[in-house]
Amino acid sequence: MVQSKAKAGFQAGVKDYRLTYYTPDYTPKDTDLLACFRVTPQPGVPPEEAGAAVAAESSTGTWTTVWTDGLTDLDRYKGRCYDIEPVPNEDNQYFCFVAYPLDLFEEGSVTNILTSIVGNVFGFKALRALRLEDIRFPVALLKTFQGPPHGITVERDKLNKYGRPLLGCTIKPKLGLSAKNYGRAVYECLRGGLDFTKDDENINSQPFMRWRDRFLFVQEAIEKSQAETNEIKGHYLNVTAGTLEEMMKRAEFAKEIKTPIIMHDYLTGGFTANTTLARWCRDNGVLLHIHRAMHAVIDRQKNHGIHFRVLAKCLRMSGGDHLHSGTVVGKLEGERGITMGFVDLMREDYVEEDRARGIFFTQDWASMPGVMPVASGGIHVWHMPALVEIFGDDSCLQFGGGTLGHPWGNAPGATANRVALEACIQARNEGRSLAREGNEVIREAARWSPELAAACELWKEIKFEFEAMDTL
């Protein structure tokens, strides 16, 4: 019966996507996954056809009518382009809003969501360029994800550190140190006043420093610095590996030696590996630091790719306790409004639509734990007031060269950063404006801290003043 009905209603051929997938009268449901694409059609392609093509090719459609369309309920499963807006101050660019039914996606799988929405349509010839700007994940879908292994509140309880940002450092040079010298640098930084040190993203298990040797020397440094400072310390041990089995072996060894936190490169490692590791971290009480290596390949271009706010949302669902988020004031890309938009999406429970900050949809995270943003890249002591004022307490401020580049060595570099941070927190708590008085706060603290004074003198002229590309 179904077969004869399908035969009777089937008309072979090619028809415009907009006839089926452009539905301006559609009202999105609470259970729909909503996506905003920045679409640049090829000359002569109407925006309605381009938006409908995106909806079709990222859901149920293909380039021609197929007989098996009659064997399913297309209206139930198809994506719908329900709204189109011209992009302000841009020629032939449009924000196309697409609603996807919940049943199109596997529960608890970021991999499946991204494969569906961006896996194929970005190579579509009718489009000159395409960028995924934002996604609204429905609560019904979010509840199928674990999210971060622990979250900000649990991390602070584990570390017994409250009322200020956490302070970190990436060990440099990133490649070439032996395991013992690497551990020595970790010890000096932690003893000097930092909360964390970090493997760089490309430190895995190279011939000059195998992972097991690094883990052991670093853990010795952590325990020695903790005994001397009476503070809980940690080092982000990068467990990223060539296979999932090897990654989990490294994670198990890190737990065995009682390290408090491990690290993963989530984009190069992949979302399946990241979700697996995040679930293991919750089960085993280990914090998870996430590096975004490779993100700029995906998100740097304004009209093509995936915006980092989408990658950050996906990471929160996949799982991670920390995520690098740019600095606004350092050497890496990041305009303040846009950056703080996705920082809020990482750590807040409910975020309202705010186009000025690039947030296209209101997002309810349904009590999913938050991710702590990590500001890292080209920052030093003179940036401290701005970083505290911009990111607030629930953040990790990470100084690599800004610690290890101190003229007196690693421990004095760490001390300089800790003094600068404590001075900024005290000034803020006393009601002073860090935006207006930040430099004076640092100068006052430098009068009684020779380590900070030396750092201030060294980096007083260093600035990274380039226009951000990531703007609305």
Swiss-Prot record:
Main localization category: other
Q: Does the keyword field hold rRNA processing?
A: no
Q: Where along the chain is substrate bound? A: 120, 170, 174, 292, 324, 376
Cofactor or coenzyme needed = Mg(2+)
One Pfam family for this entry, by name?
A: RuBisCO_large
> Which residues are recorded with the post-translational modification N6-carboxylysine?
198
Q: Where is this site: Transition state stabilizer?
A: 331
What does UniProt give as GO cellular component? carboxysome
User: Which E.C. number(s) belong to this protein?
Assistant: 4.1.1.39
| UniProt-annotated location(s) | Carboxysome
Per UniProt, Mg(2+) binds at 198, 200-201
InterPro entries given for it?
RuBisCO, RuBisCo_large_chain_AS, RuBisCO_lsu_C, RuBisCO_lsu_C_sf, RuBisCO_lsu_fd_N, RuBisCO_lsu_N_sf, RuBisCO_lsuI
How does the cofactor attach, per the note?
Answer: Binds 1 Mg(2+) ion per subunit.
Ranges annotated as spanning the membrane: none
Which of UniProt's keywords are assigned here?
A: Bacterial microcompartment, Calvin cycle, Carbon dioxide fixation, Carboxysome, Lyase, Magnesium, Metal-binding, Monooxygenase, Oxidoreductase, Photorespiration, Photosynthesis
Q: Where is the active site?
A: 172, 291
Its Gene Ontology biological processes?
A: photorespiration; reductive pentose-phosphate cycle
Describe the reaction catalysed, as an equation.
2 (2R)-3-phosphoglycerate + 2 H(+) = D-ribulose 1,5-bisphosphate + CO2 + H2O; D-ribulose 1,5-bisphosphate + O2 = 2-phosphoglycolate + (2R)-3-phosphoglycerate + 2 H(+)
A GO MF annotation of the entry reads: monooxygenase activity
Tell me, what does this protein do in biology?
A: RuBisCO catalyzes two reactions: the carboxylation of D-ribulose 1,5-bisphosphate, the primary event in carbon dioxide fixation, as well as the oxidative fragmentation of the pentose substrate in the photorespiration process. Both reactions occur simultaneously and in competition at the same active site.
Task: State the family named in the UniProt similarity comment for this chain.
Answer: Belongs to the RuBisCO large chain family. Type I subfamily.
PANTHER family, per database record: RIBULOSE BISPHOSPHATE CARBOXYLASE, RIBULOSE BISPHOSPHATE CARBOXYLASE LARGE CHAIN
Q: What else is known?
A: The basic functional RuBisCO is composed of a large chain homodimer in a 'head-to-tail' conformation. In form I RuBisCO this homodimer is arranged in a barrel-like tetramer with the small subunits forming a tetrameric 'cap' on each end of the 'barrel'.
- Subunit info? Heterohexadecamer of 8 large chains and 8 small chains.
Report the protein name in the record: Ribulose bisphosphate carboxylase large chain
User: Which gene produces this protein?
Assistant: cbbL
